[in-house]
Swiss-Prot record:
Organism per entry: Burkholderia thailandensis (strain ATCC 700388 / DSM 13276 / CCUG 48851 / CIP 106301 / E264)
Residue positions binding ATP: Q87, G105, E106, G107, K108, T109, D515
InterPro entries referenced in this protein's UniProt entry, alphabetically: Helicase_ATP-bd (IPR014001), Helicase_C-like (IPR001650), P-loop_NTPase (IPR027417), SEC_C_motif (IPR004027), SecA (IPR000185), SecA_CS (IPR020937), SecA_DEAD (IPR011115), SecA_motor_DEAD (IPR014018)
Bilayer topology: Peripheral membrane protein
UniProt enzyme class: translocase
Quaternary structure and partners: Monomer and homodimer. Part of the essential Sec protein translocation apparatus which comprises SecA, SecYEG and auxiliary proteins SecDF-YajC and YidC.
Keyword Plastid carried by entry: no
Protein name, UniProt field: Protein translocase subunit SecA
Cofactor binding summary note: May bind 1 zinc ion per subunit.
Length: 930
């Protein structure tokens, strides 16, 4: 109450920030007449002048008013678009490293040019991040005209580009690309063997378009580069026969033995999207597997040798019970293609991990592709936090403002609209059944159609969009369907969605990033005519002119009919997705309206709010076909959505806390890789490793400070001869000297090892041997890091069970992950020293052959894939608690095939705390390796 009172007096933080930025806008506007007088060459010359001033020490903040004024004027001349004052505020918000929430149609693409131009002047690169290749290419070409006019270079970073094209794209002042591609390039850069094979520069400044989609919706799904692992095709086929033999149990058994309405073999947790075998289910599964010869008679699924079978059983169960065709995936050309749960788009090439995709392929009887082994991975949360400055834009960020601030340290600023919004958001209507709801939707669509008002109908799945399409056909209402299956026609459908009497059905936010213009998008329609080679040139000109002539009439006709009407056929789990759907109407002060039609059979209501709403309907004795339209019900639904949002936030936060452990270790490994790549000679590092390893070997047989009776010299001699190629008569040495001690024996062995090493170097030359050492070091580090990632995944899967032993799973995970990491670094030292000491060479050519053989034995895996995949079963484990276990199946991920790397990792000072979490100084912990 006090806060509200103070806000009335002083205004909210958002209002104060906007007011502060408006003062800067006034300064920019005052410069406008002066900038307008400049010739094109003088305007272009301003870029060089700004760069000189930056080199002389002037800050970007001080340059901002003049740079923004120059960018606005250049845009007016080149693009025929002048930035509005509110767009200038948006540009400032981006420059100061915040998130700008701007309504649909307010020109976010143009806003990005202000911050991108100003920050590109420093010469350290700017990344503009979009959600798909189409938008990256469109924006780079469209806004590239403005940047090129001002003397800046623009690059496009697309999947499948050649290595030199990528290097050129990143070397440009401003680089457009997708979030996936930027992340994969970072991982690839940290897998290279030569410094000039990298493509990225240090990560400086990023402007993330649709920031909510990238930093929140996709935050739970890491980017993974993987290679093919062992083939289990036959096992997936056999396991696919199991789920149809099992029956679902209805109801959960309570402590007193009640609660089960119908006994069965497995239970479904719809809220957490999990499946669990019951006791009878385990027994039946074990019996069936024994019949098929997969386990021994009387053996348990939980026996150590059957743990992998358990994984396959659950993968098959999840595929049959939680993942449905035309909702979570489609089958096209003999492949299972994932449907993005947030946009409704198809994602060809992407795959679910943890065996789930193979289980779905077995279910659909298509070719089963091999499982993968992780080579490198990172989450978007940890990738984007590496930028020196991060900012973003979206139409809907305010509901997630807390998460942006908590996870990324980004403040959200709501930018005022250029014109007052005129959209009318009507109360939700709730029906008892889905049939009644669809009847009401058809009635509403018919009314709009008859008065010439365009309608956009939002659905939550392909299945629902096709059901509604079928109902509209029966009702005789012409319409277009915009879902993943019509991806190729998407732009054409969206371009005409604002014309009178147009009815468009869209899954989630298909078509996001493209405005629906009342009366139709003339530019888009004209572009389609221009691209059609079958139409003669004079006919093209006539048709385009006709389009422009018609548009004014159509635009006024649609405005009079009420503008674009949005119909939501279901509430999403997140209020933000609902707001995105509503936001398609009422752009730039146009009229518009929206309404959601719900039924008690919808998952959100059934799981979270159904009982309360059903009780209200029963109390009111609602007849069939009648709807509730009341604020109390809408608030009840929003409360349910808030619960889901809070739960999803907890999931993402928990996952981040677990991923931070591997992220800290990743920083150490990648920093050491970079140091190895950049070092001309690593003899000193190899020498320190050799001395450490030899010391450990000697101390096993001759402990420090021990007496002669405790020494095992024959065993030491044999170990040095067999494992380290050192033929030393240590027993003779001891017999000849009565006063020799343990330290002197160590010195003698170390000296012999150094001489053995120097003899190899002398044979082939320092330069050749140094290149060999670097190659061995990198290959060994990469191979053991891959194995370490697999070990971390394995650890994560079972760590939540520590909670039953009254231990904190998170602390246990950190402790064991640190122990695994320390063991991995020790293994690197042992392995590299062993190879260098044992390699037999007489010439530089033999040295190259040896390096190639070692690479073949333990080097890269073939068929590398780039995945945006889920933690799946690991997710439940990863969180060590109900929150993340609930969300295991929600972390549906995606996997992408691309070809061919990254920002430098922030340096860790020698005296700084080691990022692995041990509490030691870096030089005494993982800095020892470097």
């Amino acid at each position: 109450m006090t806060t509200g009172f103070l806000q009335k007096i002083f205004g909210s933080r958002n209002q104060r920030l906007v007011k502060q930025y408006q003062k800067t806008v006034a300064t920019i506007n005052a410069l406008e007449t002066q900038i307008e007088k400049l010739t094109d060459d003088q305007l272009r010359g301003k870029t060089g002048e700004f760069r000189q001033r930056i080199a002389a020490g002037e800050s970007l903040d001080k340059l901002l008013p003049e740079a923004f004024a120059v960018c606005r004027e250049a845009s007016r001349r080149v693009l025929k678009m002048r930035h509005f004052d509110v767009q200038m505020i948006g540009g400032m918000v981006l420059h100061y490293g915040k998130i700008a929430e701007m309504r649909t149609g307010e020109g976010k693409t143009l806003v990005a040019t202000l911050a991108a131009y100003l920050n590109a002047l420093a010469g350290r690169g700017v990344h503009v991040v979009t959600v798909n290749d189409y938008l990256a290419q469109r924006d780079a070409e469209w806004m590239g005209r403005l940047y090129n006019f001002l003397g800046l270079s623009v690059g496009i970073n697309l999947s499948g580009m050649e290595h030199d094209q990528k290097q050129a794209a990143y070397a440009a002042d401003i680089t457009y690309g997708t979030n996936n591609e930027f992340g994969f390039d970072y991982l690839r850069d940290n897998m290279v063997y030569e410094t000039d094979a990298r493509v990225q520069r240090p990560l400086n400044f990023a402007v993330v378009d649709e920031v909510d989609s990238i930093l929140i919706d996709e935050a739970r799904t890491p980017l993974i580069i993987s290679g093919q692992a062992e083939d289990h095709t036959e096992l997936y086929v056999r396991m696919n026969a199991l789920p149809p033999l099992l029956e679902r149990q209805i109801g959960e058994e309570k402590a007193d033995g009640t609660g089960v309405e119908k006994p069965g073999d497995y239970t479904l947790d719809e809220k957490g999207r999990q499946v669990f075998l019951t006791e009878s289910g385990h027994e039946k599964a074990e019996r069936m597997l024994a019949e098929w010869g997969l386990i021994g008679d009387g053996e348990s699924l939980y026996a150590p040798q059957n743990i992998t079978l358990m994984h396959h059983v659950y993968a098959a169960l999840r595929a049959h019970t939680l993942f449905h065709r035309d909702q979570h995936y489609v089958v096209q050309n003999g492949e299972v293609i994932i449907v993005d749960e947030f946009t409704g788009r198809l994602m060809p090439g992407r795959r679910w991990s943890d065996g789930l995709h193979q289980a779905v392929e077995a279910k659909e009887h298509v070719k089963i592709q091999s499982e993968n082994q992780t080579l490198a991975s990172i989450t978007f949360q940890n990738y984007f936090r590496m930028y020196a400055k991060l900012s973003g834009m979206t139409g809907t960020a305010d509901t997630e403002a807390y998460e942006f601030n908590e996870i990324y340290g980004l403040e959200t600023v709501v930018i005022p609209t250029n014109r007052p919004p005129k959209r009318i958001d009507k109360q939700d209507q709730i029906y008892k059944t889905a049939k009644e709801r669809y009847d009401a939707v058809i009635r509403d669509i018919r009314e709009c159609y008859e008065r010439g008002q365009p309608v956009l109908v939002g659905t939550t799945s392909i299945e629902n969009s096709e059901l509604l399409s079928h109902l509209l056909k029966q009702a005789g209402l012409p319409h277009e369907v915009l879902n993943a299956k019509q991806h190729a026609r998407e732009a054409a459908i969206v371009a005409e969605a604002g014309r009178p009497k147009r009815v468009t059905i869209a899954t989630n936010m298909a078509g996001r990033g493209t405005d629906i213009v009342l009366g139709g998008n003339v530019e888009k329609q004209a572009a389609f005519i221009e691209a059609d080679e079958a139409i003669p040139a004079d006919e093209k000109a006539r048709r385009i002119q006709q389009l422009h002539d018609e548009w004014e009439t159509l635009h006024e006709q649609v405005k009079t009919a009420g503008g674009l009407h949005i119909i939501g056929t279901e509430r999403h789990e997140s209020r933000r997705i609902d707001n995105q759907l509503r936001g398609r109407a009422g752009r730039q002060g146009d009229p518009g309206s929206s309404r959601f039609y719900l039924s008690l059979e919808d998952p959100l209501l059934r799981i979270f709010a159904g009982d309360r709403v059903r009780a209200i309907m029963d109390r009111l004795k609602m007849p069939e076909g009648e709807a509730i339209e009341a604020g109390i019900v809408t608030r009840s639904i929003e409360s349910a959505q808030r619960k889901v949002e809070a739960r999803n936030f907890d999931i993402r936060k928990q996952l981040l806390e677990y991923d931070d452990v591997s992220n800290d270790q990743r920083k150490v490994i990648y920093q050491q890789r970079n140091e190895l790549l950049e070092a001309h000679d690593i003899a000193e590092t190899i020498g320190a490793m050799r001395h450490g390893v030899i010391s450990e070997v000697v101390r096993q047989f001759v402990p420090a400070g021990s007496i002669e009776e405790q020494w095992d010299l024959p065993e030491l001699e044999e170990t040095l001869r067999n494992d380290w190629q050192l033929d030393l008569a240590i027993q003779e040495m001891v017999n000849e000297s009565s006063s020799i001690n343990a330290d002197e024996i160590l010195d003698a062995v170390t000296t012999a090892a150094d001489e053995h090493y120097e003899a190899k170097v002398a044979l082939v030359g320092r330069e050749s041997f140094s290149a060999f050492e670097r190659s061995i070091m990198l290959q060994t580090l990469d191979r053991l890091w891959r194995e370490h990632l697999a070990a971390l995944d394995h650890l994560r899967q079972g760590i939540h069970l520590r909670g039953y032993a009254q231990k904190n799973p998170k602390q246990e995970y950190k402790r064991e992950a640190f122990e695994l990491f320390a063991a991995m670094l020790d293994a690197v030292k042992q392995e590299v020293t062993r190879i260098v000491m044992n390699v037999q060479i007489q010439s530089p050519e033999q040295l190259e052959e040896a390096a190639e053989q070692i690479e073949e034995q333990g080097g890269q895996l073939g068929n590398v894939e780039f995945q945006h995949a889920d933690f799946a079963a690991a997710a439940a484990a990863s969180a060590g608690g109900a929150v993340v276990a609930d969300a295991t199946a929600e972390m549906v991920g995606h996997a992408m095939s691309h070809s061919g790397p990254a920002g430098e990792v922030p340096r860790v000072g020698r005296n700084d705390p080691c990022p692995c979490g041990s509490g030691k100084k870096y030089k005494h912990c993982h800095g020892k390796l470097s």
